[in-house]
A protein has these predicted regions:
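Conserved PLP phosphate-binding loop immediately N-terminal to the Schiff-base lysine helix
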Residues: 1-14
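Conserved core segment of the aminotransferase class I/II
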Residues: 16-93, 100-101
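Short helix-capping segments at alpha-helix termini
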Residues: 16-19, 105-110, 186
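Short, conserved active-site loop motifs that form the nucleotide-linked donor/cofactor pocket
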Residues: 23, 110, 145
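Helix N-cap motif at beta-to-alpha junctions
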Residues: 47-48, 127-129, 168-170
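Conserved glycine-rich beta-strand-loop-beta hairpin in the small C-terminal domain of fold type I
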Residues: 75, 91-100, 112-125
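PLP-dependent enzyme catalytic core of the Aspartate aminotransferase-like
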Residues: 138-147, 153-186
Length: 186
């Protein structure tokens, strides 16, 4: 749901009948509609037999429960949230553009990516020449900004920072200004 204009997500269920026959799809309104606290999700099964097996296992473990708020909120989000989601996508894209432009103009050592989906911007900080612990310590102690750590997603994430762009522009601007000022002291 959270994809920039022009991007498209291909679901495994839409590939081939053979793959669809062994695929179970989990979806949730949590990130898209900011409903994480309601713990709501939906599962799409390929066959009734797979669904019945899964439901029986949930019941056996005594975890097959929803709350009334999550059901109503999920239905409302998917039925009536399209206009809100369209506005959110524009806002997120504008925030991503701001991050890229700010870094290009003020923090050339940092290189934000163009995300294919979601509101998390990966920023390549390898040009600073710090290992992951030094980078995190520098950002927290000198810049006063706690980024998500890229290396938590594997070796390829080393030297990268994750910035949540789903917040007011003023918060992003303040964080980037603090990073700019801290890097200027190097």
């Amino acid at each position: 749901d959270l994809m920039p204009k022009g991007n498209h997500h291909n679901m495994m269920l839409d590939t081939t009948p053979e793959i669809a026959a062994i695929t179970t799809t989990f979806i949730a309104p949590s990130k898209t509609f900011n409903l994480a606290g309601l713990q709501s999700s939906t599962i799409v099964f390929d066959t009734v037999e797979h669904k019945d097996t899964y439901v029986a296992d949930l019941k056996r473990q005594d975890i097959a429960r929803n709350n009334c708020f999550s059901l109503v909120a999920t239905m409302a989000a998917y039925r009536y949230g399209e206009e809100w989601l369209d506005q959110l996508l524009v806002y997120l894209e504008d925030n991503m553009k701001f991050i890229r432009q700010y870094c290009q103009e003020n923090i050339p050592q940092l290189h934000p990516n163009d995300p294919e989906a979601t509101y998390l911007c990966w920023i390549d900080a390898r040009e600073l020449g710090m290992d992951d612990d030094e980078l995190q310590k520098f950002m927290v102690e000198k810049a006063g900004v706690a980024f998500g750590r890229g290396e938590e997603f594997g070796k390829g994430g080393s030297g990268f920072l994750r910035l949540n762009a789903a917040c007011p522009r003023s918060v992003i601007e303040k964080a980037l200004r603090q990073v700019k000022d801290a890097i200027a002291t190097l």
